[in-house]
């Protein structure tokens, strides 16, 4: 009798899980106030949201914990003085602003094309780290074209003027990847203002681990 009474009390107060809940009952938002965000990718509207399957797991491409270091060494939180490090909510905010027509922002996937073929963050454009690295064959003319045509810098009597240059939000594979850090460090060498460079340190590793939408080249 006492056991029956105790069970009744626990059930009525919600202290026993009855097992009736399903994954469909538990939506997965980006934040408490944001379920999804719509951005432009390849001229099309793409909805960024998290995988709604509560049983989803990490994809194999980012399941490794121990890539050899070097070269895959853990990157610091502060990459360089003046460079702001972003999380997921912040990069989504930049993506939304860019998609709404703010052309002062450019979100850059710094990875080589073979990585990008596997998927990227919707709204990002690919400018591989090798394209800005003289040590990897990038010549002054091609670097200059990127500065002028993609980043909005201007050349004045042989010197770069970054007054109207875009705010660049850069990422690569994650906290163990050196591709976006390489891009950022080269830009700083070229005189690009640190306050106009943002870094999403978590990159594709964190993005995919959180089940956020990934854009494939065909999408």
Please state what every model-predicted region is.
Residues 1-9:
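Bacterial N-terminal signal peptides that target proteins for export
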Residues 74-166, 217:
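Positively charged, proline/Ser/Thr-rich regional signature most characteristic
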